[in-house]
């Protein structure tokens, strides 16, 4: 609720000052506070001091050793601390999580200042218009970076929060190692882990669209995952027998056979729970299962088995027939 209020403060700031993009945060900050760019001996992005202190003007300090786009975000964040009436005293924005005051109140104020900064630099109506006008998420990301004056990761996280279910992003460094990944709310597929390699990209080959752009030494990938996938298997036969056949061909160890079946049933149980949550078609359920199976490398022997698609199609038809 308070986060919503923080966003409204940023919206009001836009209309009150008739701001244009990229927002001149330096000019704006000077209307509310003393502003200094400084070097810090510790790992800190910025400070908002003298907040709501009688007779004192608030002061904003920004770490000048950070990249320009990051300084802009920090500045927008500190303006948030200054204008939100319940943010009081002195707030230090420490980058190193181990040194952060972990109190709930501090974390809430940080989330509010971030929500304020996000809305100030990348207004909701602007992002929504970009999403309406363009299909290519790489194009949209690059427009946000350029016209919003933000970092590619800030633009990516902004899109993540606004996209509907079914989108996943990956950031890969020059050594082809994943440094960041995430998904829009409600997406079935789980993002790969930090440190995973290019195999994670291959596992998303079922995506209906892929958008890529590079920024510095990083490559950004957006995947649009299909709402529905055509059932590929012939689904002749009983899915239980098919699963039995598959696990027996993979291993003769009965304990391992049981473990495989439990893992497969875990994914299918999830699919079953989706049926209870809302309307599903055979094809949408198949897509949900493909998304859940695709990045589970422990199940590779199963999912790469020639009878797996038959098994999955048969199981899904069985699930649907029971509705
Ligand atoms: Zn802060």
What does each model-identified segment do?
Residues 1-323:
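Active-site hotspot residues in diverse enzymes, especially metal/ion-binding acidic/histidine motifs
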């Amino acid at each position: 609720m308070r986060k919503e209020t923080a966003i409204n403060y940023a919206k009001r700031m836009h209309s009150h000052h008739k701001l244009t993009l990229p927002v001149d945060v330096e000019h704006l900050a000077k209307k509310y506070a003393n502003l200094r760019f400084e070097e810090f001996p510790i790992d800190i992005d910025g400070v908002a001091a003298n907040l709501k202190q009688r007779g004192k003007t608030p002061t904003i300090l920004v770490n000048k050793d950070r990249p320009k786009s990051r300084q802009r975000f920090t500045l927008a964040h500190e303006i948030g601390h200054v204008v939100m009436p319940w943010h009081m005293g002195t707030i230090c924005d420490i980058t190193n999580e181990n040194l952060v005051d972990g109190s709930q109140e501090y974390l809430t104020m940080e989330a509010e200042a971030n929500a304020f900064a996000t809305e100030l630099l990348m207004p909701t109506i602007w992002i929504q218009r970009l999403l309406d006008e363009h299909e290519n998420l790489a194009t949209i990301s690059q427009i946000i970076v350029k016209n919003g004056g933000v970092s590619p990761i800030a633009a990516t996280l902004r899109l993540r929060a606004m996209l509907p279910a079914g989108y996943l992003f990956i950031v890969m460094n020059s050594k082809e190692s994943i440094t960041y990944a995430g998904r829009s709310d409600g997406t079935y597929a789980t993002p790969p882990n930090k440190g995973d390699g290019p195999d994670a990209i291959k596992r998303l080959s079922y995506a209906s669209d892929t958008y890529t752009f590079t920024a510095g030494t990083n490559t950004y990938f957006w995947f649009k995952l299909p709402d529905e996938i055509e059932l590929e298997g012939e689904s002749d036969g009983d899915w239980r027998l098919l699963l039995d056949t598959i696990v027996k061909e993979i291993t003769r160890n009965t304990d391992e056979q049981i473990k495989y079946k439990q893992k497969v049933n875990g994914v299918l149980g999830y699919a079953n729970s989706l049926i209870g949550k809302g309307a599903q078609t055979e094809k949408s359920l198949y897509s949900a299962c493909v998304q859940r199976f695709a990045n589970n490398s422990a199940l590779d022997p199963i999912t790469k088995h020639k009878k797996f698609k038959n098994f999955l199609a048969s199981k899904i038809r069985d699930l649907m027939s029971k509705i």
